[in-house]
Curated annotation (Swiss-Prot):
Known function: Converts heme B (protoheme IX) to heme O by substitution of the vinyl group on carbon 2 of heme B porphyrin ring with a hydroxyethyl farnesyl side group.
PROSITE patterns registered for this protein in UniProt: UBIA
Pathway it works in: Porphyrin-containing compound metabolism; heme O biosynthesis; heme O from protoheme: step 1/1
Enzyme class: transferase
Membrane topology of this protein: Multi-pass membrane protein
Regions crossing the membrane: 35-55, 56-76, 98-118, 120-140, 153-173, 180-200, 226-246, 248-268, 292-312
Enzyme Commission number, as recorded: 2.5.1.141
Keywords, in A-Z order: Cell inner membrane, Cell membrane, Heme biosynthesis, Membrane, Transferase, Transmembrane, Transmembrane helix
Protein name: Protoheme IX farnesyltransferase
Molecular functions (GO terms): protoheme IX farnesyltransferase activity
One Pfam family matching this protein: UbiA
Length: 313
């Protein structure tokens, strides 16, 4: 045996991550991020102080990246649950495309970047609110509430309701009733929306041992809670009109959309078995997305209409 052969050492093969750009984008939860960006834009546009376009774009980018960071940390911590659920089994970590340490590092890096950038370039109230939003979703909801209480969606919904508040703070450096109203609408919208999903995905949640309300309290109790929360949501969403915070266009839209939400929620409560029950839950889930989108979309249009009227008159 030669000296070279005697001293040769076999090294383990270098493990190269299979993750592509699309896998890291998936970690950001793009569909959730789109809702975050949309509601934040509304909060920014209706604020009485208008940021310089560069700062406005920076604010929205930071809020989007912060929301994505929270999503990545959520996927990192919940990879064991995701692997057990049909709806989430194809996410990057369960599929082995991204490792848990990579996802955690990715999420933490984005979180620090988004908060620091928003704080330094815009203002620290917005930065602090964004940091709280990420912490609440990634730690309070993901690591605690999701696995321990059937009220996980109710309390955890606060994180998803904060983006318009962060955006308003970015524009004004302060808080006011208007962003709090937007917060309350999203907060009250979250339980009917996600419990409708949980009704027709209850087997998935039960398999993963996630204590969603239909799994813990049963489908009938969930249907009642959906109806009650919808009644409160519709009422709270209409009130800003008579209170003078939003205009007639918003008010009429909220009344019309509220009637639709109540109708779909009542159908969920009424149909309790068979395909009709699943169909009603799916219909509410889909309509609730349209409800929130149209309700928020009318606000920038109202602001634009007032601006045009002011120029004319």
């Amino acid at each position: 045996m030669s000296v070279i052969e005697q001293n040769s050492v076999e090294y383990p093969p270098l493990i190269v991550s299979e993750a592509g750009v699309s896998d890291y984008i998936a970690l950001l939860k793009p569909r959730v991020m789109s809702l975050v960006v949309f509601t934040a834009l509304v909060g920014l546009v209706i604020a009485p102080v208008h940021l310089h376009p560069v700062l406005a774009a920076t604010s929205i980018l930071c809020i989007a990246v912060g929301g994505g960071a929270a999503g990545a940390l959520n996927m990192w911590y919940e990879s064991d649950i995701d692997a057990l659920m049909t709806r989430t089994a194809n996410r990057p970590i369960p599929r082995g495309r991204v490792s848990s340490p990579e996802a955690a590092a990715f999420g933490i890096t984005l979180a620090i970047f988004s908060v620091a950038t928003l704080g330094v370039l815009v203002n620290w109230l917005a930065g602090a609110l964004l940091a709280f939003t990420i912490f609440f979703y990634a730690v309070v909801y993901t690591m605690w509430l999701k696995r321990w209480t059937a009220q996980n969606i109710v309390i955890g919904g606060a994180a998803g309701a904060l983006p318009p508040v962060v955006a308003w703070a970015a524009a004004t450096g302060s808080l006011a009733p208007q962003p709090i109203i937007l917060f309350l609408i999203i907060f009250l919208w979250t339980p009917p929306h996600f419990w409708a999903l949980a009704l027709f995905r209850s087997d998935d949640y039960a398999r993963a041992k996630v204590p969603m309300l239909p799994v813990v309290a049963g489908p009938d109790a969930t249907r009642l809670q959906i109806l009650l929360y919808t009644i409160v949501l519709v009422t709270v969403a209409i009130l800003p009109w008579p209170l003078g915070y939003f205009g007639a266009a918003y008010g009429l839209t909220s009344v019309a959309l509220g009637a639709g939400m109540l109708w779909f929620a009542f159908n969920v409560y009424r149909y309790r078995t068979g395909t009709q029950a699943n169909r009603a839950a799916r219909a509410l889930f889909k309509f609730s997305l349209l409800y929130l989108f149209l309700l928020f979309a009318v606000l920038p249009l109202e602001v634009a209409a007032h601006a045009v009227a002011a120029m004319i008159w």
